[in-house]
Amino acid sequence: MKNKQQKKLTDLAERLLKNNFNGIGKPKTKGSLLLHSRRTIKEQARIIGKAATDLNLKNLKLLTPTMAQDYLTHCRDKGCCQKYLSTIKCSLQRVLFKHENNKLTRVIALERKEIPLTDKNRAYTNEQIRFIMTAMNDRAKLSTLIAVDAGLRVEELLTIRRTNEASASKSRKWSDLRFSGRKEGVRYIVTGKNGLRREVLISKDIAELMETKRLVQPKTIIDRGHPFAINYDLLGGKRLTDAFYRASKKTLGWNHGAHGLRFTYAQNRIDKELTNFTESEANLILSQELGHFREEITKRYLAPYSKRH
């Protein structure tokens, strides 16, 4: 329902921009508010449609300068970069062009200190992930949902098998406490680093969506020079890495990589779903779910960012 409403509002925004600010084929002049490319019109319409949806508006005419200003501040607080904030501001001002007070105040982006990626908390908030997905196609969206829901590496999306098609590696002792605290889901097998096969749990509704993408016959693709026989029409490996990078930079202005989805999974598990276990027990469960088996590596996803570390 929300996607339909956002599409409707985006279409309305595109018509508004074409009717009032269409500068395609016209000479550019200093101070002109006209938009001179179809791509810019499409992008600003997308931004307007998302803003109106986030503000729960049924019509663009209901947008007020105060609401637009508050939304700008909200985007700043989410971590959007200065360039993207400026684009949002210009887009919303075009919707408000008939208002007497249609000039929005510039919002300054939060300062971002440049530190090595290895020292950063690479986790995305759920809101940031939803925001990133607005700039993705349906295939990339579903792949992103699966990755964060099951804590997968990008290449593991290419190895998903049903439990009657593969089994977890017998060289490891698997805890029966894995997936404790998770809601109902479907277990699958993925192959991770060094060929380790492990069970992962995908939420029931997401698994049902994924099964609609199952291929009639396995298909071989090449990712980073390695062949993968895929059973589902998903985006994985370098293709998902690249798609996630583009969407994250476009919406947030920065990117911690699709691997940050594993940080999100780990911190959600420890902070929200494994609270009935001791820290040591929770770390053991999580290490097996992530396919690491080494506590020092698992802690990299948590300390000092998790509430329990």
What are the residue ranges of the model-derived segments?
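N-terminal DNA-binding module of tyrosine recombinases/phage integrases
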Residues: 1-37
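Non-catalytic DNA-binding core/recognition domains of DNA-processing enzymes
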Residues: 29-103
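Flexible interdomain linker/hinge and immediately adjacent N-terminus
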Residues: 69, 73, 101-130
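DNA breakage-rejoining catalytic core of tyrosine-based enzymes
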Residues: 79, 114-131, 185, 194-205, ...
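Basic, Lys/Arg- and aromatic-enriched nucleic-acid-binding interface segment
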Residues: 126-158
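Conserved tyrosine-mediated DNA breakage-rejoining catalytic core shared by Y-recombinases
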Residues: 160-208
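Active-site/catalytic core of tyrosine-dependent DNA strand-transfer enzymes
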Residues: 201-256, 260-261, 265
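Short, basic (Lys/Arg/His-rich) helix/loop patches that form interaction surfaces
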Residues: 241-288, 292-296, 307-309
